């Protein structure tokens, strides 16, 4: 049973210091050993008494217990759903021209497989209309195209963009797309530039790393060179668009050397100035077990350590991997 007469706190210590987490103020306070010993073990000390009195006067160590945790927006949830939706993700197809080894549709994940399913225009239109009807209080709206490989349905993407421009021209709508980058043509690039569509490329690292997992369907041919050609094409057609609208999603395979990937992302001229989002391959919801090499874990933890040091101003940020 909880002691309702004790302050609502949690005491903890490190190798050298003592702390109190004050729940009601959501703050961590460094205290003396004497105060820690009194609050944790009820061992009285004159020094502790003075320090505790000071903390109480500053608003800490209250006995109030939380009876209900409730988000401040809970009472407005229905209104948000009716008027403040701001994002729509359209899975325009489940088809893909690649067979990435860790894809959720590869057959290794529970309840997911590649299929030939495509979204109809009627479904896409209905979804867009629903978003519009439930976003009247949202200043900006975001529509994302996803797959499979969404560029296999470029025709539908164009239909959606043109419909939104025609019917909802008074709204600020942002379009974005996640792609393996192998199907771009000058026509598609020009259309994306014209409509300011943001592109997120799936890129796992240099050629030998990327091609290990991202191969074309029906072959063992890697997709790096084709993706690279698309990046160069967009950059050559409109550098400002490229710098503003192109980003990268990188999946780290724990069997690869982390340093090689970080150096590639940091130094490549078509990548280093653009935003990269990185995630580590895991075996959640899959029948395959993901194995981590000792070198990968060591390098990853070292980069985390350097990141913390940079936040403490102990080292310059330039020594921390940008990714």
Go through each PLM region and give its residues.
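Glycine-enriched alpha-helix->loop->beta-strand junction motifs that scaffold or abut catalytic
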Residues: 193-199, 270-272
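A cross-family glycoside hydrolase active-site/sugar-binding cleft signature
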Residues: 89-91, 142-146, 176-180, 200-204, ...
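N-terminal [4Fe-4S]-dependent radical SAM core
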Residues: 5-21, 25-30, 49-89, 107, ...
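Radical SAM enzyme [4Fe-4S]-AdoMet core and its adjacent flexible, acidic
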Residues: 208-228, 232-323
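Auxiliary Fe-S-binding modules of radical SAM enzymes
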Residues: 1-25, 29-44, 290-292, 304-306
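Conserved alpha-helical substructure of the radical SAM core
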Residues: 73-190, 194-195
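Conserved radical SAM core fold
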Residues: 109-110, 150-152, 181-186, 198-220, ...
């Amino acid at each position: 049973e909880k002691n309702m007469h004790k302050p609502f706190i949690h005491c903890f210590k490190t190798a050298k210091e003592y702390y109190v987490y004050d729940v009601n103020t959501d703050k961590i306070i460094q205290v003396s050993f004497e105060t820690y010993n009194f609050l944790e073990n009820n061992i009285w000390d004159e020094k502790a008494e003075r320090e505790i009195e000071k903390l109480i006067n500053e608003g800490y160590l209250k006995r109030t217990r939380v009876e209900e945790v409730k988000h401040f927006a809970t009472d407005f949830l229905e209104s948000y759903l009716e008027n403040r939706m701001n994002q729509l993700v359209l899975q325009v197809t489940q088809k893909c021209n690649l067979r990435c080894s860790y894809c959720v549709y590869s057959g290794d994940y529970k309840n997911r497989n590649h299929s030939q399913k495509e979204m109809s225009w009627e479904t896409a239109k209905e979804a867009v209309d629903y978003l519009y009807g439930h976003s009247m209080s949202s200043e900006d709206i975001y529509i994302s195209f996803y797959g499979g490989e969404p560029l296999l349905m470029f025709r539908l993407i164009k239909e959606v963009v043109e419909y939104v421009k025609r019917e909802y021209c008074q709204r600020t709508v942002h379009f974005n797309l996640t792609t393996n980058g192998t199907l771009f043509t000058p026509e598609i690039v020009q259309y994306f530039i014209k409509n300011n569509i943001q592109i997120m490329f799936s890129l796992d690292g240099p050629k030998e790393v990327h091609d290990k997992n991202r191969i074309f369907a029906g072959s063992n041919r890697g997709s790096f060179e084709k993706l690279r050609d698309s990046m160069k094409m967009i950059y050559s057609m409109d550098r400002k668009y490229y710098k503003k609208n192109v980003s990268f999603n990188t999946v780290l395979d724990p069997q690869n050397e982390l340093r090689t990937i970080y150096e590639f992302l940091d130094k490549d001229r078509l990548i280093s100035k653009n935003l990269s989002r990185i995630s580590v391959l895991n075996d959640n919801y899959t029948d395959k077990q993901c194995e981590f090499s000792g070198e990968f874990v060591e390098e990853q933890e070292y980069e985390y350590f350097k990141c913390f040091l940079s936040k403490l101003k102990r080292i310059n940020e330039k020594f921390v991997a940008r990714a």
